[in-house]
Amino acid sequence: MAQTSLEIVSPEKRLLSRSVDMVVIPAAEGELGVLPGHAPMIVLLQGGTIRLYQNGQVTDRLYVAGGFAEITPERCTVLADQARPVAEISATEAEKRLADAEAAYATVDKLDITALDAAMESIQAARAMVEAARH
């Protein structure tokens, strides 16, 4: 089966660089499956889980808080704001992050659209982290 090259990079380090049969990324418009030969595009990512597939099975799962992905017919490059393997996330840590994000939202000036959007993105990413930690 043809494969696509996948690279996942966070500000701290390159987390992953290898070939996969398929990768599913949490695009802002919804989950997006990337197979070899995919149409070129750049997509905005929302908080969620990236799933890597080999032989029809999920082999790895990584949490991302957001970022961008560049897709070409040969490769998918993810530039993540924050990223880490799902196995390294504890439910307690994720729930604390969600509580902190909700507390920060409560203090935001509701007339400041930019701050409100940022607070909502933090809550969405924290909810995605909680969901990832539970699976």
Swiss-Prot record:
Cysteine pairs bridged by disulfides in the record: none
Main location: membrane
Location of this chain's protein in the cell: Cell inner membrane
Superkingdom field: Bacteria
Keywords: ATP synthesis, Cell inner membrane, Cell membrane, CF(1), Hydrogen ion transport, Ion transport, Membrane, Transport
CDD domains: F1-ATPase_delta
Subunit structure of this chain's protein: F-type ATPases have 2 components, CF(1) - the catalytic core - and CF(0) - the membrane proton channel. CF(1) has five subunits: alpha(3), beta(3), gamma(1), delta(1), epsilon(1). CF(0) has three main subunits: a, b and c.
Chain's role: Produces ATP from ADP in the presence of a proton gradient across the membrane.
Family assignment from sequence similarity: Belongs to the ATPase epsilon chain family.
NCBIfam families the UniProt entry points to: ATP_synt_epsi
Protein's UniProt name: ATP synthase epsilon chain
Taxonomic classification: Bacteria, Pseudomonadati, Pseudomonadota, Alphaproteobacteria, Acetobacterales
